[in-house]
Amino acid sequence: MAKRRAAEPLTFRVPWKRLLLSDFPEEPPLWVPPSGAARPLKRQGDAGTMAEPASAPRKRRGGGDDEPELQGRGLEPGEPPPGEQGEPQVSRAAGGGDRVESAGSPQGADEVHSQHNEDFWQYNTFQYWRNPLPPIDLAALEDVSANSLTETLEDKNEGVEIDMES
């Protein structure tokens, strides 16, 4: 069994990420492998390569300067990353009044964020993933005349009366 590289993504992209990228004319690749020059696949016969910091094995657990790597971890599938959720903060203005500010974003960006958040939950609804219903031809329903409708109702009433008499 082949070993999976740690740099490969575990899951495919979720639909809400596609919404954010829909403004671009061409879609970016799903995964770009790291450059091969930084880390060779096999060890070289050179003893000098072991002393280089680039060839040193990376730690899987523990502290370090790898904060961007750890940002996306710990999320459920389909959950937006926490960095994009601007929670409002209350701050005192110089005039003494309270005002609500978003975390590092202008008011227009909050509206855009809420729009993306709504779209994210729209993709997770049961109705979105169901197969679409075939189109209904309303002209077939309009062809029914009022006379045929009343005749049908009268026929049903006669059947009910007969059933009740017996």
Curated annotation (Swiss-Prot):
The keyword Zinc is annotated on this UniProt entry: no
Keyword annotations: Phosphoprotein
Source taxon at top rank: Eukaryota
Organism of derivation: Rattus norvegicus (Rat)
Keyword NADP tagged: no
Pfam families associated with the record: WRNPLPNID (PF15017)
Region feature (Disordered): 25-116
S-S pairs: none
Name of the molecule in the record: Uncharacterized protein C9orf40 homolog
Modified residues (Phosphoserine): 105
